[in-house]
Amino acid sequence: MQQFCGVNVIAYYSTSIFRDGGYSLSEALLVSMGGGIINFLFAIPAIYTIDTFGRRNLLLVTFPLMAACLFFTGGVFNIPESNRDPRIACITTGLYLFMAVYSPGLGPVPFTYSAEAFPLHIRDIGMASSTAITWGFNFIISFTWPALRRSFGDTGAFSWYGAWNIFGFVFCYFLLPETKNLTLEELDNVFSVSNREHAAYYTRKLPWYLKKYILRKDVPPFPELYEFAANDGQYPQEKPDAKHIEGNNSVPPSADREVFSRTR
C-alpha cells in the first residue's frame, strides 16, 4: 500500500505534473524541490507519534486525507488553462498537502510495522522480502504512470491512486492490529489471531467507536484483540470482585460472637 498511495509517482514526475499545471520549467523544478523539503520536515514528528499515537492510528488518519488530496488535485486539472494562477496554486496546494500527510504516516510506518510483524527466527528474511517487494512495485508504478495519464487523463490518474488510499483505509481498519508499546510476547499473541477474527473484532468495535467518539458517551474500555479472540469473539467474562464475594458471604460480627460463645 505504500507504493499504491501514489507518493513515488508524485516524487518522480512532480516536475512534469507541475509543468502540465502551468508552471515554466524553472518554476516546476523549484516547486518540486519544495515538495521534498516538506516531505523531510513533516517526517520528523513521526519520531514521537509512531509510539504515542500508534502505527495503526497514523495510517487510519492519513489514508483518507491522502485520498482527499489526490481527488482534489485531480479535479483541479479540469480548471481551464486560461485561469493559470488559481490552477497552479490549487495543484501546488494539493500535492504539498499530500506530502505533508504522507510523511508522518505511510512513510515510516510500513518499515517499522514489517520489522515487528515477522517472528524473530525469520525477521531478516521477512524484512528483505518485504523491501524487495516494495521496490518491485515501485518500479511497476513509476513505469506505468505515463501510460496511465495518457489513458485516463490527469483527473483519472490521480483519482485512481485516491481510490487505492480509500482501499488502504478499509484494509487497515479491519486487518491491521496495533503494535505500539507491545512486548515480544504480546506481539506473538496479536499476530496469532486470524484475519477472520481480527475483522470480526473491529466490526464489533464500530459501535463502541460511535458511542465514545461521536455520541461522547461514557463507555467501558473495549477488550484487547487477543482477549477477544481467546473468548471466541465474545466479550471476556468479568471476574467477580473479591470484595463483593467476601461481602456477600461474610458473617456479621454479632453472629460471630454468638457462635463463639456457644462453642465455649
Residue spans of the language-model regions?
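Alpha-helical transmembrane bundle of multi-pass membrane proteins
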Residues: 1-264
